Every structure is written in structure tokens, then in C-alpha cells.
């Protein structure tokens, strides 16, 4: 079983860490595809990649919500000027 860190920001990826997480996911995929890992290590690496993907997805969803709010604010400002 894979142990996960319990921290307040475990569900999010800091702005500077998004690219690092994506790079790590790509590295994990390369290690798995190389065929050189033992089966247990493959499962551990896969679990890590899934967790990183979940964190990246949460980060992107949060940023999408921020963008939607900004666009809505701009639209409201445009409509109030009419």
C-alpha cells in the first residue's frame, strides 16, 4: 500500500511546482516503459504518477475557476458601460 503525505496543500501544486510535477510524471513513465523496474517498483511509481496527476488536475481546475471569474468580471464591466 502506498502511503500519502497528509499536508494542508497535498491537493494542490504550487505555481512553480506544476512544471516540476509534469516533468516527474514524464520521468516515471520513461522508467516504467524502460522495463528495468521490478514489478513492485512499477506499482509504486504508477501510484506516485497518479497522485501527481491528481494534484496537477486540481491545480488546473483552480486556475480555470480563477480565469472564469476574471472573464465574468470583465464581461460585467463591459455590460455596465452600456
From Swiss-Prot:
Its EC number is 3.1.11.6. The keyword Cytoplasm applies. One of its GO terms (cellular component) is exodeoxyribonuclease VII complex. The keyword Nucleotidyltransferase does not apply. Pfam families: Exonuc_VII_S. It is an enzyme of class 3 (hydrolase). It catalyses: Exonucleolytic cleavage in either 5'- to 3'- or 3'- to 5'-direction to yield nucleoside 5'-phosphates. It is found in: Cytoplasm. GO terms for molecular function: exodeoxyribonuclease VII activity. Keywords: Cytoplasm, Exonuclease, Hydrolase, Nuclease. GO terms for biological process: DNA catabolic process. InterPro entries: Exonuc_VII_S, Exonuc_VII_ssu_sf. Bidirectionally degrades single-stranded DNA into large acid-insoluble oligonucleotides, which are then degraded further into small acid-soluble oligonucleotides. Heterooligomer composed of large and small subunits. Belongs to the XseB family. This is Exodeoxyribonuclease 7 small subunit. It comes from Nostoc sp. (strain PCC 7120 / SAG 25.82 / UTEX 2576).
Amino acid at each position: 500500500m502506498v502511503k500519502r503525505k497528509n499536508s494542508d496543500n497535498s491537493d494542490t501544486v504550487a505555481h512553480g511546482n506544476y512544471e516540476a510535477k509534469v516533468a516527474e510524471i514524464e520521468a516515471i513513465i520513461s522508467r516504467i516503459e524502460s522495463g528495468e523496474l521490478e514489478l513492485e517498483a512499477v506499482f509504486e511509481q504508477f501510484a506516485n504518477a497518479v497522485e501527481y496527476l491528481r494534484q496537477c488536475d486540481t491545480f488546473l481546475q483552480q486556475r480555470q475557476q480563477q480565469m472564469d471569474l476574471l472573464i465574468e468580471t470583465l464581461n460585467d464591466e463591459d455590460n455596465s458601460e452600456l
